[in-house]
C-alpha cells in the first residue's frame, strides 16, 4: 500500500497569501542518476502553501522520478528536498509525516475492508479523530456505502478514491498526485478537482503530474514543464500565458506545452 509512506470548481487556485509565504516544498539541485542515465537534472523550485503546481512533460521527462524523490521513496543522487522546513534526507520521519503521495496505480491490502484501511492508516499517523475525519472523507469521495467492502469488490476508480481517503486522513501539508484521475468517471473527475482545490485553499502545497493538460489548467496556479529531466519552464500560469502570447503562440496549456518542449534543447 503506497499511501502511508512513513501514506464543481473550474477556477484555478490563486497565489498564496502573504501569511503563507514560506515554502511547503523546497527543492534545490535535485538530480537523479541511474548509472550513465540522468533521469532528473539539477531541478530547483518551491511550492508554497495554497499553491497547486502542475508537473508536465513528455513520456520519459522525469516526472514520476521527480515525485518519487520528493516523497522520499527513492533517494536523489544529489540535491536537497525540504518538506515544511524538514530536510527529507536528514529528518525523514518528520518530513514524511507532513506529506501524502498518491501513485498512478492504487495499491491496497487485499484482506482489509475500506474502513479497516482507514483504521490502519490512523494508527500509523496517530490520528485521534479518525472516525469523524474518515467518515467525512468517504462521504466527500462518494464511497461511504463501500466501507465494509474489500478491495477486490471495488472498481479501479473506487480503489483510487480509497487510497486518497487514506492519504488525506492525517491532513497532510504537502500532497503529491501522479495521474490522479485514472479510472474515474466524469463525476469522479469533477469531485477530485474540487477536492484538490479545497486542500490548496486550506493551505496545502500540491503538485500534480498529469497528461490531462486541461485539468491542470483548471486547478493549477503554477506549472513546471520538464524535458529530458531538465526544467524548461517554471512560472505561474498567467506568466506562462503572457510569455507565449507575446511570442505569437496560443495561450492554452496544451499549445504552450507543445511549443515549449519543441523549442527546448536536450541536455548537452
Q: Where are the regions a protein language model picked out?
A:
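Conserved ABC transporter NBD signature motif
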Residues: 79-90, 94-95
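Catalytic Walker B motif of ABC-type/P-loop ATPase nucleotide-binding domains
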Residues: 175-179
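Conserved ABC ATPase signature
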Residues: 150-157
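Helix-to-loop junction immediately C-terminal to a conserved catalytic motif
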Residues: 71
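Conserved ABC ATPase "signature" region
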Residues: 119, 123-146
